[in-house]
Amino acid sequence: MLRAARERFSCTGYAGTSMDGIAEATGLGKGSLYGAFGGKQGLFRLVFDEYCTAAVEQARRDLDGPDDEAFARLATHVRAVAVATAADVARRGCLLAKGTAELAEHDPVVAARSLRTLDELEQILTTDIEACQRHGDLDPAADPNALAVLLLAVLRGIEALGKGGKDEAALHTVAETALAILPRP
């Protein structure tokens, strides 16, 4: 049920999603939805939280491991974002980006969850970059947190470019360029 609601929000955004549309997508009556979630906002917040949790868990799985494989994991992760974005032919984009852009200004719960997610993703990237530095794949004098913020911006940018219609080659070029400019020892 939550997956169907997430798909509806991903396709049409918060403002473009009605309770009738959610009821249709989930097969539940509007009364049941209001009873369970208090309304569209409550349901969106739950779906958004679960999406953010899954994004962080995926990044952690992608980037956790021994130091000698850290750069390979990082490269695979960056390239995977480009591949997944290119595969999104409907150009729905990322619910984290969509929800943040649409609601963070007016919904403090969404704003806080978005910031927490970005902070967690940044920390996961920082940890992997530090492993790359320990192993000798990246310059140990470089600021690992600054590199993590840069890569986080690149990853979010790849998703935005894909949503905007940039082709697969452009997305892969961004990913490869980001990896190429990381400071080597």
Task: Annotate each PLM feature.
Residues T76-A84, D119-R134, V154, G164-P185:
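C-terminal peripheral helix-coil segments that are non-catalytic and often amphipathic
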Residues M1-R6, I22, V47-Y51, A55, ...:
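Generic hydrophobic, amphipathic alpha-helix propensity
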Residues L46, R60-R92, P144-L151:
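Hydrophobic alpha-helical connector segments
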Residues G29-A36, Q41-D49, I129, L151-L152, ...:
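A generic structured-segment signal
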Residues R73, A87-V109:
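Amphipathic alpha-helical segments used for helix-helix packing
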Residues R92-A97, P140-L161, T173-I181:
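Hydrophobic alpha-helical segments that form the core
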Residues V56, D68, A72-T76, P108-R134, ...:
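Amphipathic alpha-helical packing segments from all-alpha helical-bundle domains
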